[in-house]
Structure formats: structure tokens, C-alpha cells
């Protein structure tokens, strides 16, 4: 066994703040080294008992709110703070593997999953880690050509020395305003990814952030200059917002020097993410769509703008709003939504934004919202679960929320 070094400095004492999946991966990795003491702070009460000055390094889980007491104290020790991805980078930086980081408010999970899928389909060894669910250090023993990392703004705030071969930002819209003072601060946290990337680009055509690439969307298809490359109907994906996701993937692969025509053949096989604008069933002429992964206002706007050209959506909206600005969706509600059923912990908060702009009803929970929506829906209409909120008031996560929705649709079909 060997001692643990970080930036050529021997580390003998480390504090792990937070012990979720990320914290556990750090501790499991450090168990391979000698001469290092790792202390674990699992809650507020434990944290205040540690002398932060006594540690060589402090690793912080992304879920720890640095803007709130008692964790504000960590801001005085910025030089000591490292993320799990910094540690991962220290141990792979001398290999030939390429690292790609993707952040954004909406679409990043689809982009990283599609990128990883295409790389594997082209015959490369690729790993997919980060905010998508698998901590990077869990993959440290694997051999790979490419490492695709989904990063959140919280993770970027913790970066110390990581250098990605390529970083990109997509579709920044207001989110996590319970953790940031305003949208500008949140947006800047995303843009800080550039500081940790050797190559970098932004694709966010909706917010006026410059995109200088060669790909355009014209009438449901992707063009490069004047050459048509791919039509949405040639893919297994639903909604034109996925053309934007494909453009980001093509830009990534372009910058990695890979063959775009071969990549497009792989993209045609990609089935998309669970719980992201997925048609569940058509029951009694009504189409039920699961977009449980729509956990912020921007994601729900993207869904509304992509799935129909008519005012025929019955929308299930609600959960934990995270300070979201629901006035931003009023234009899309007016254009595409027939009725809204609002449920969850922040239903009155959401109501305060959309009251007077659409027909709606408050519900006790998602199940009641679904039952009322299915009763109201007519043939050729759409019942859309796109909550624009986090799910932890009622569910363990967006995946469980989506599964419950799918089960409710299945039960409805059995009764029909």
C-alpha cells in the first residue's frame, strides 16, 4: 500500500463532509492508502465539532449547502476544498484517456448518456460518471478511452484543480434559486466550468449566449452548413428539443476528432432516457407522457414547446419548487395547455405565479392530480407529467415519481 498524495503533497488527514454516494466513494477509495486519517461529518451537529484548520484536505459532497450555516465556515478554507472529481483526475491525468464534462439546467443527462452510448457503439471504451448517478471514483480501476462526466453547478463550485479535455454548457435556465442569490450567480457558476477545461463551448440558443457552431435546426432536421444530416423522425427520440441535444453531442464528437457520419448512425439507435418526454401509453385516445425528469421550469417549458402544436395538454405540475420562476412558463401554458393540476409541497407558491393565466385546480398529491386529469382528458389530448419541481416531498426521486405515473397509466388501461 502507498501513501495518498494530492498535487504532489502527502495527505495525512482529510475531512469528508457529507456521506452520500459521493462521500462513500471517496472514503472507499482512500481506504486503499496508508498513513491517512479520514474523518466523516454526516450532519450539522457533527460538522461543528471538527477543527477545519487541522486538515490537509476537505472533501465536500455536492449536496452540502455552502451558503447556509454551519457550512458557510468552509468558504474560509477554499484552498483546502477538493471534489471527488479532483481526486479522480489526479489519478487518471497521466493516462491517454480523454475527459468530457457537460453541465446545464436541462438536457445534460441526455447529452452525456447519448455521448457515452455513441462512443461505445463506435467501439471505444467509455465510462459515464458524475451527477448522472455513478461517482467517478467508483470507476477508478477501469480502463477507458473516454470519461464522460455530468457535472452540476454545485460540483463546479467545489472544483480545485481538475482539467477536462473538453467542457460544454447547454440550456441554462433558472434553477436551484434556493442555493443561489439570483439567476446571474447560478449562470456564472455554470460558466466557471471554462476555468477547468482545455477546450470549451456553449450551446444555449434560447438565452442569447453565442453559439458559433456549424449545425442548425431547420424544419425538424439538423443541417451542417447546407447539408441535411438527420431528421428527428429517423431517431427513436421524441420532441424537437432532442435535436438540440444531438447538436451538442455532434459538437463534442467533432472536437474529439471522430467521424460524424458514423456517429449519426449510432445516434439513430439511441433510445433516450427513462422519464424524459417518454410516451407511456395511449388510453381511450389520450396520450400519457412521462417527463418526470423535468425538475425545473426550463425543462417543462422545453417539453411543452416540443410535443404538440395544439392547445391540447393537461399538465401535472408540482413538488418542491426550489425558488423557480413559474411566470416564465406562462407563454407556453397559454399556447399549449388546456388545464393544469397543481400538487405538492409548493402548490400555493406555483399558484401565485400562474393564477389568472390558465385554468387550474389544486390537488392533494400526484395521484389525485392524475385521476382528475384522466377524467378530464378527451381523445387526441395529452396528459403530461412534467412537474417543473423536485420530487422529494412525496417521492425518493424523479425516477420513483415517473414509475408511479407509469403504474397509474397501467392501472387506468386495465380498467378501460
Curated annotation (Swiss-Prot):
GO terms for biological process: cell division; cell wall organization; peptidoglycan biosynthetic process; regulation of cell shape. The keyword Iron-sulfur does not apply. One of its GO terms (molecular function) is ATP binding. Belongs to the MurCDEF family. One of its GO terms (cellular component) is cytoplasm. It catalyses: UDP-N-acetyl-alpha-D-muramoyl-L-alanine + D-glutamate + ATP = UDP-N-acetyl-alpha-D-muramoyl-L-alanyl-D-glutamate + ADP + phosphate + H(+). Transmembrane segments: none annotated. It comes from Francisella tularensis subsp. tularensis (strain WY96-3418). Cell wall formation. Catalyzes the addition of glutamate to the nucleotide precursor UDP-N-acetylmuramoyl-L-alanine (UMA). This is UDP-N-acetylmuramoylalanine--D-glutamate ligase. InterPro entries: Mur-like_cat_sf, Mur_ligase_C, Mur_ligase_C_dom_sf, Mur_ligase_cen, MurD. Its EC number is 6.3.2.9. It is found in: Cytoplasm. Pathway: Cell wall biogenesis; peptidoglycan biosynthesis. Keywords: ATP-binding, Cell cycle, Cell division, Cell shape, Cell wall biogenesis/degradation, Cytoplasm, Ligase, Nucleotide-binding, Peptidoglycan synthesis. ATP binds at residues 104-110. SUPFAM superfamilies: MurD-like peptide ligases, catalytic domain (SSF53623), MurD-like peptide ligases, peptide-binding domain (SSF53244).
Amino acid at each position: 500500500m502507498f501513501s495518498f498524495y494530492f498535487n504532489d503533497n502527502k495527505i495525512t488527514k482529510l475531512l469528508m463532509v457529507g456521506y452520500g454516494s459521493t462521500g462513500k466513494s471517496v472514503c472507499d477509495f482512500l481506504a486503499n492508502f496508508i498513513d491517512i486519517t479520514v474523518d466523516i461529518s454526516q450532519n450539522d451537529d457533527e460538522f461543528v465539532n471538527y477543527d477545519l484548520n487541522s486538515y490537509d484536505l476537505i472533501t465536500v459532497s455536492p449536496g452540502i449547502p455552502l451558503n447556509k450555516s454551519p457550512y458557510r465556515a468552509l468558504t474560509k478554507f477554499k484552498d483546502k476544498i477538493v471534489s471527488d472529481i479532483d481526486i479522480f483526475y489526479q489519478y487518471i491525468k497521466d493516462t491517454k484517456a480523454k475527459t468530457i464534462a457537460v453541465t446545464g439546467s436541462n438536457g445534460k443527462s441526455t447529452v452525456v448518456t447519448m455521448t457515452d452510448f455513441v462512443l461505445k457503439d463506435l467501439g471505444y471504451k467509455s465510462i459515464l460518471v458524475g451527477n448522472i448517478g455513478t461517482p467517478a471514483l467508483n470507476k477508478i480501476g477501469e480502463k477507458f478511452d473516454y470519461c464522460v462526466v455530468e457535472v452540476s453547478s454545485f460540483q463546479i463550485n467545489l472544483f480545485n484543480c481538475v482539467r477536462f479535455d473538453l467542457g460544454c454548457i447547454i440550456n441554462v435556465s433558472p434553477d436551484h434559486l434556493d442555493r443561489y442569490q439570483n439567476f446571474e450567480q447560478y449562470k456564472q457558476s455554470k460558466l466557471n466550468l471554462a476555468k477547468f477545461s482545455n477546450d470549451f463551448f456553449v450551446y444555449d440558443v434560447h438565452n442569447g449566449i453565442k453559439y458559433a457552431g456549424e449545425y442548425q435546426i431547420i424544419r425538424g432536421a439538423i443541417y451542417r452548413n447546407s447539408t441535411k444530416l438527420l431528421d428527428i423522425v429517423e431517431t427513436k427520440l421524441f420532441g424537437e428539443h432532442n435535436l438540440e441535444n444531438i447538436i451538442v453531442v455532434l459538437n463534442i464528437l467533432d472536437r474529439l476528432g471522430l467521424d460524424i457520419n458514423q456517429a449519426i448512425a449510432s445516434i439513430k439507435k439511441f433510445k433516450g432516457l427513462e422519464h424524459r418526454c417518454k410516451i407511456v401509453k395511449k388510453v381511450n385516445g389520450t396520450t400519457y407522457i412521462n417527463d418526470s425528469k423535468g425538475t425545473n421550469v426550463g425543462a417543462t417549458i422545453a417539453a411543452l414547446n416540443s410535443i404538440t402544436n395544439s392547445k391540447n395538454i393537461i399538465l401535472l405540475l408540482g413538488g418542491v419548487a426550489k425558488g423557480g420562476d413559474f411566470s416564465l412558463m406562462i407563454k407556453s401554458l397559454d399556447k399549449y395547455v388546456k388545464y393544469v393540476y397543481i400538487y405538492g409541497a409548493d402548490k400555493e407558491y406555483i399558484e401565485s405565479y400562474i393564477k389568472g393565466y390558465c385554468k387550474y385546480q389544486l390537488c392533494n398529491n400526484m395521484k389525485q392530480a392524475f385521476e382528475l386529469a384522466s377524467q378530464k382528458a378527451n381523445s387526441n389530448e395529452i396528459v403530461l407529467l412534467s412537474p417543473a419541481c423536485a420530487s422529494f416531498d412525496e417521492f425518493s426521486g424523479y425516477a420513483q415519481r415517473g414509475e408511479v405515473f407509469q403504474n397509474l397509466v397501467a392501472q387506468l388501461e386495465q380498467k378501460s
